Amino acid sequence: MLLFTFTFQALVLALIIFSFILVLTLPVIFASPKGWENNKSRIWLACRFWFFLVFLIGILDGIFL
């Protein structure tokens, strides 16, 4: 159970840090000329990873806690 608690806390910390990074970088990318066209695949990948973290944390929270 201790390993799960540590893993869960690490995932929540990763979500917080990744969200902070997205809040800082996405407006810069969208404000730059041709930012969307040049970085479209990176933006979608980052959004997919963020949603994956949110759903993974939600599922783990519902199952184990």
Swiss-Prot record:
How does this protein sit in the membrane? Multi-pass membrane protein
Q: Which SUPFAM superfamilies match?
A: PsbZ-like
Instruction: List, alphabetically, the InterPro entries matched.
Output: PSII_PsbZ (IPR002644), PSII_PsbZ_sf (IPR036512)
This chain belongs to the protein called Photosystem II reaction center protein Z
One annotated GO biological process: photosynthesis
Which family does this protein fall into?
Belongs to the PsbZ family.
Q: List, alphabetically, the Pfam families matched.
A: Ycf9 (PF01737)
Q: Which gene encodes it?
A: psbZ
Q: Where are the transmembrane segments?
A: 11-31, 44-64
Q: How does it assemble?
A: PSII is composed of 1 copy each of membrane proteins PsbA, PsbB, PsbC, PsbD, PsbE, PsbF, PsbH, PsbI, PsbJ, PsbK, PsbL, PsbM, PsbT, PsbY, PsbZ, Psb30/Ycf12, at least 3 peripheral proteins of the oxygen-evolving complex and a large number of cofactors. It forms dimeric complexes.
**Keywords, alphabetical:** Chloroplast, Membrane, Photosynthesis, Photosystem II, Plastid, Reaction center, Thylakoid, Transmembrane, Transmembrane helix
Asked if the keyword Cell membrane belongs to this entry, the reply reads: no
Provide the primary localization: plastid
